[in-house]
Each structure stands twice: as structure tokens, then as C-alpha cells.
């Protein structure tokens, strides 16, 4: 199961175009996307970036580029703790950013320091989906070291449950992505973000 390929503003109704206009005018903060692998963070980040002309930082991609190796290779050579430290340092660096969509790796929100850094200049949005949906989205992807030899619903469900409390504690907003296309997910997210931002003023 994949997200609907349609991810541009073309063909949207007037209400959606008005929503996009209002959000462009009001958004002066970062949007930090967290959640389990396959929840839709990268797809949503690309769509939001396109709609609102916001910068996008894919943390895993940037870390991989800077280290000159893939995420599985970083885990293999240096271990998970080394990788988690790279995540923390990058989040600290991103404090200088504004109007940026930050797509975090699946484990980034497991560290309380990371969550603190995320919240300093933005809203944290948790994207979530059922274990079966996650498996369908990641089963052809071998760039997931924590799922190596464990691509099954039972293992994914166990790992998601272990992370659930910290994910939910970190999140300012939770968006379910099952059975929704990317436009529906993004519309729900920005509508709720605008409501939250208006209350925080």
C-alpha cells in the first residue's frame, strides 16, 4: 500500500487553496515529523514542502550523505549509539532553521534530549499507521537496519508498542495515515496546526 501519487495543489478545491494561502502567511515555525518507519514522514514532507515552499531536511539522508555511507552501514560499522548521537547533533544544528520541515528517523524521538531540541522552534507531529500498513510500505526496502530479518507484522507491532509512549509524549499532534492519501493527511495536519498556533498566540 502506497500513498496516492497526487501530491500537488493542482485540482484542489477553493477551500483547500484558501487553506494553503492562510498557512503560507501564518507559518513561521518548523514542522518536525516523527513516527515509525513507513508511517509516511518522507512523503508528507515532500508534499508540504511543495505546497508551502518550505525547506525540507530528511535527517537520515543528510546523516548518510555526511558520513559517506548508508544508515545500515553506519549501524554496522559504528553501532546504534553512534548513529543516535549524530541525530542529536543534527537536531541541535537545526535550531537555526525556520519554516523547515524536518523528517526524523524512526528512533529519533526515543531520546528526551532530541524531543527537547525538536520543540524549541516548531511543532512535533506524530504520523502513525497500523503494523500491517507499515509492513506493506517497507517490505521492499532493505535500508531499515532495525527490521533486518524481521519483516513481519508481529515484530513490527512489538517494536511500535515499545515506542508508542515516547512517540505520543513527544507529539504536539498525532495524525493517523491509514487509508488516507497524502493530500488528506496534509490537509488534516495543517488545519490542526493552524488551530494550535492560533491558541498559542
Regions found by a protein language model. Give the residues of each.
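Hydrophobic anchor at the beta1->P-loop junction of P-loop NTPases
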Residues: 33
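Walker A/P-loop
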Residues: 42
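ATP-dependent small-molecule kinase phosphotransfer cores
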Residues: 58-108, 112-119, 143-145, 157
Amino acid at each position: 500500500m502506497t500513498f496516492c501519487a497526487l501530491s500537488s495543489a493542482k485540482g484542489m478545491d477553493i477551500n483547500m487553496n484558501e487553506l494553503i494561502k492562510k498557512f503560507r502567511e501564518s507559518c513561521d515555525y518548523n514542522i518536525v515529523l516523527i513516527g515509525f518507519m513507513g508511517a509516511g514522514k518522507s512523503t508528507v514532507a515532500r508534499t508540504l514542502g511543495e505546497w508551502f515552499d518550505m525547506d525540507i531536511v530528511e535527517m537520515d539522508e543528510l546523516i548518510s550523505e555526511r558520513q559517506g555511507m548508508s544508515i545500515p552501514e553506519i549501524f554496522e560499522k559504528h553501532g546504534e549509539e553512534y548513529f543516535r548521537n549524530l541525530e542529536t547533533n543534527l537536531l541541535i544544528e537545526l535550531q537555526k532553521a525556520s519554516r523547515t520541515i524536518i523528517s526524523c528517523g524512526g528512533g529519533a524521538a526515543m531520546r528526551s534530549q532530541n524531543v527537547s531540541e525538536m520543540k524549541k522552534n516548531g511543532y512535533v507531529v506524530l504520523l502513525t499507521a497500523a503494523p500491517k500498513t507499515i509492513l506493506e510500505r517497507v517490505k521492499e526496502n532493505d535500508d531499515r537496519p532495525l527490521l533486518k530479518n524481521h519483516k513481519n507484522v508481529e515484530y513490527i507491532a512489538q517494536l511500535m508498542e515499545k515506542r508508542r509512549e515516547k512517540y505520543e509524549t513527544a507529539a504536539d499532534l498525532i495524525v493517523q495515515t491509514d487509508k488516507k492519501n497524502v493530500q488528506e493527511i496534509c490537509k488534516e495536519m495543517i488545519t490542526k496546526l493552524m488551530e494550535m498556533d492560533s491558541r498559542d498566540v
